Amino acid sequence: MSTKKIASLCVIKNKSKFLLLKRINEPNIGKYVPVGGKLKDHETPKKAAKREVFEETGLKFNKLEFCGVLTETSPTNYNWISYIYLVETDIVDIPKSNEGKLEWLDFKEIKNIPTPKTDDIIYKYIIDKK
Protein backbone atom coordinates (compact mmCIF):
# COMPACT_ATOMS: atom_id res chain seq x y z
CA MET A 1 0.00 0.00 0.00
CA SER A 2 1.25 3.49 -0.81
CA THR A 3 1.57 6.37 1.62
CA LYS A 4 -1.60 8.42 1.93
CA LYS A 5 -1.63 11.79 0.21
CA ILE A 6 -3.14 14.67 2.17
CA ALA A 7 -5.52 17.07 0.43
CA SER A 8 -8.13 19.72 1.09
CA LEU A 9 -11.36 19.93 -0.89
CA CYS A 10 -13.79 22.83 -0.89
CA VAL A 11 -17.40 22.36 -1.89
CA ILE A 12 -18.69 25.67 -3.24
CA LYS A 13 -22.48 25.85 -2.95
CA ASN A 14 -25.12 28.32 -4.14
CA LYS A 15 -28.55 27.25 -2.84
CA SER A 16 -29.01 23.72 -4.26
CA LYS A 17 -26.20 24.00 -6.81
CA PHE A 18 -22.57 22.95 -6.47
CA LEU A 19 -19.65 24.44 -8.41
CA LEU A 20 -17.84 21.34 -9.65
CA LEU A 21 -14.76 20.93 -11.79
CA LYS A 22 -14.72 18.47 -14.68
CA ARG A 23 -11.06 17.47 -14.49
CA ILE A 24 -8.79 17.37 -17.52
CA ASN A 25 -5.88 15.84 -15.57
CA GLU A 26 -5.33 12.89 -13.25
CA PRO A 27 -6.45 12.07 -10.68
CA ASN A 28 -10.10 11.66 -11.66
CA ILE A 29 -9.69 12.78 -15.27
CA GLY A 30 -13.11 13.34 -16.89
CA LYS A 31 -14.93 13.29 -13.54
CA TYR A 32 -16.66 16.12 -11.69
CA VAL A 33 -15.06 16.98 -8.36
CA PRO A 34 -15.02 19.77 -5.78
CA VAL A 35 -12.05 22.12 -6.17
CA GLY A 36 -9.03 21.25 -4.09
CA GLY A 37 -5.62 19.69 -4.01
CA LYS A 38 -2.65 18.52 -2.02
CA LEU A 39 -1.32 20.36 1.01
CA LYS A 40 2.08 22.01 0.75
CA ASP A 41 4.71 21.53 3.46
CA HIS A 42 3.77 23.33 6.70
CA GLU A 43 0.36 24.38 5.31
CA THR A 44 -2.83 23.91 7.31
CA PRO A 45 -5.76 22.15 5.61
CA LYS A 46 -7.85 25.35 5.75
CA LYS A 47 -5.10 27.47 4.16
CA ALA A 48 -4.64 24.80 1.48
CA ALA A 49 -8.38 24.86 0.74
CA LYS A 50 -8.36 28.65 0.36
CA ARG A 51 -5.26 28.52 -1.85
CA GLU A 52 -6.64 25.75 -4.06
CA VAL A 53 -9.98 27.55 -4.47
CA PHE A 54 -8.15 30.68 -5.60
CA GLU A 55 -5.76 28.77 -7.90
CA GLU A 56 -8.55 26.77 -9.56
CA THR A 57 -11.33 29.39 -9.68
CA GLY A 58 -9.82 32.82 -9.02
CA LEU A 59 -12.33 33.20 -6.17
CA LYS A 60 -11.42 34.19 -2.61
CA PHE A 61 -13.44 33.15 0.41
CA ASN A 62 -12.56 33.83 4.04
CA LYS A 63 -15.33 31.86 5.72
CA LEU A 64 -14.96 28.12 5.15
CA GLU A 65 -16.97 25.64 7.20
CA PHE A 66 -15.14 22.45 8.18
CA CYS A 67 -17.26 19.39 7.33
CA GLY A 68 -14.95 16.51 8.22
CA VAL A 69 -12.20 14.22 6.99
CA LEU A 70 -12.63 11.60 4.26
CA THR A 71 -10.13 8.73 4.28
CA GLU A 72 -9.77 6.60 1.16
CA THR A 73 -7.87 3.32 1.37
CA SER A 74 -7.19 1.19 -1.67
CA PRO A 75 -4.85 -1.63 -2.68
CA THR A 76 -3.77 0.68 -5.54
CA ASN A 77 -1.82 3.93 -5.34
CA TYR A 78 -5.07 5.81 -4.74
CA ASN A 79 -4.89 6.52 -1.01
CA TRP A 80 -5.97 9.91 0.30
CA ILE A 81 -6.84 11.77 3.48
CA SER A 82 -9.02 14.72 2.44
CA TYR A 83 -10.12 17.60 4.65
CA ILE A 84 -13.54 18.74 3.44
CA TYR A 85 -14.72 22.35 3.62
CA LEU A 86 -17.92 24.08 2.53
CA VAL A 87 -18.44 27.64 1.39
CA GLU A 88 -21.87 29.04 0.58
CA THR A 89 -21.95 31.90 -1.89
CA ASP A 90 -24.25 34.11 -3.96
CA ILE A 91 -21.81 34.07 -6.89
CA VAL A 92 -23.41 32.73 -10.07
CA ASP A 93 -20.83 33.61 -12.73
CA ILE A 94 -18.70 30.62 -13.66
CA PRO A 95 -14.99 31.38 -13.49
CA LYS A 96 -12.46 29.89 -15.92
CA SER A 97 -10.04 27.23 -14.68
CA ASN A 98 -6.78 25.77 -15.98
CA GLU A 99 -7.71 22.46 -14.28
CA GLY A 100 -10.83 21.79 -16.36
CA LYS A 101 -14.36 23.10 -16.87
CA LEU A 102 -16.27 24.53 -13.89
CA GLU A 103 -20.05 24.08 -13.86
CA TRP A 104 -22.90 24.83 -11.48
CA LEU A 105 -24.79 21.56 -11.05
CA ASP A 106 -27.92 20.90 -9.03
CA PHE A 107 -27.64 18.20 -6.37
CA LYS A 108 -30.13 16.06 -8.32
CA GLU A 109 -27.88 16.20 -11.43
CA ILE A 110 -24.82 14.90 -9.60
CA LYS A 111 -26.05 11.30 -9.57
CA ASN A 112 -26.16 11.38 -13.41
CA ILE A 113 -22.62 12.63 -14.05
CA PRO A 114 -19.26 10.92 -13.59
CA THR A 115 -17.93 11.55 -10.07
CA PRO A 116 -15.58 9.63 -7.81
CA LYS A 117 -17.71 7.15 -5.83
CA THR A 118 -16.29 8.46 -2.56
CA ASP A 119 -17.63 11.96 -3.25
CA ASP A 120 -21.28 10.85 -2.93
CA ILE A 121 -20.94 10.87 0.85
CA ILE A 122 -19.66 14.47 0.77
CA TYR A 123 -22.68 15.83 -1.12
CA LYS A 124 -25.13 13.79 0.94
CA TYR A 125 -23.58 15.09 4.16
CA ILE A 126 -23.84 18.70 2.99
CA ILE A 127 -27.45 18.35 1.79
CA ASP A 128 -28.63 16.41 4.86
CA LYS A 129 -26.49 18.46 7.29
CA LYS A 130 -25.31 15.28 9.00
Name every feature range the model reports, one short phrase each.
Residues L39-N62, E72-Y125:
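Unchanged
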Residues V33, E65, I84:
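Conserved beta-strand segments that form the floor/walls of ligand-binding pockets within enzyme
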Residues M1-L19:
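Conserved N-terminal beta-strand and adjoining loop/helix that marks the start
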Residues K17-E55:
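Conserved Nudix-box catalytic region and its N-terminal flanking loop in Nudix hydrolases
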Residues G68:
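Catalytic phosphate/metal-binding cores of nucleic-acid and nucleotide-processing enzymes, i.e., regions
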Residues D128-K130:
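C-terminal regulatory/oligomerization modules of transcriptional regulators
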